[in-house]
Amino acid sequence: PVSCMVVTSASQNSAFRIPTTCLAYPKAAIEQGNYAGYLTCDTNSTPHGKTFATTKNSQAGQEKEIDSFLADYFTSVCGARAQTGEIDTLSALNNAANELRAHDNGSKMVISVISSGLSPTGLLAGSSNLLNADANDIANQLASMGALANFSGIEVHFYGLGQASGEQVIPNSIATKLQSLYPTLVEATGG
């Protein structure tokens, strides 16, 4: 059994594609009657989600209901857009971990993050000091501040770290830093 959260940083009017592998976790959660949720990386974004449970008695009725749950969930996730330019990926990642903990039923917990990792706001707002610091040092400092959620027992998958959309370009040095930083943050508290 699996429960999951999808975190996306898609902004208003931006088109993006959610990786198929990312959608396998919410599909499994919905089919198993577990929690599936999503949120955007806006500052103070509210998680959306629920535990999906069928109400029909027949196998055919349950399958139809699950298909409807899947369609509704995927439409919501693919349509989710950040409402402000205040993207804070770390805050959203922490919120997702806390949301899964609040719905913990003993199943495997998975967070799928679809983001470049760039955050113009929050504790990881891109500054030259941050981008030049060691990922482990950043993780240790944030953990000592209590700025990281408990990721123990939570599997986190990142999609698109260091990749820009449209005509934006992220320099290789920054892309490499982002690709190492976020997994290190998760590992710092047991993920």
How would you describe each model-predicted region?
Residues 35-39, 153-156, 190-191:
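A short amphipathic beta-strand at an alpha->beta junction
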Residues 1-114:
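Von Willebrand factor
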Residues 19-23, 90-97, 139-142, 179, ...:
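Extracytoplasmic/secreted envelope proteins and their assembly/folding machinery
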Residues 6-14, 56, 73-87, 165-176:
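Second-shell loop/turn segments in exported
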Residues 118-179:
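VWA/integrin I-like adhesion module and closely mimicked acidic/polar interface patches used
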Residues 24-31, 75, 95-105, 119, ...:
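Sec-exported extracytoplasmic/periplasmic mature domains
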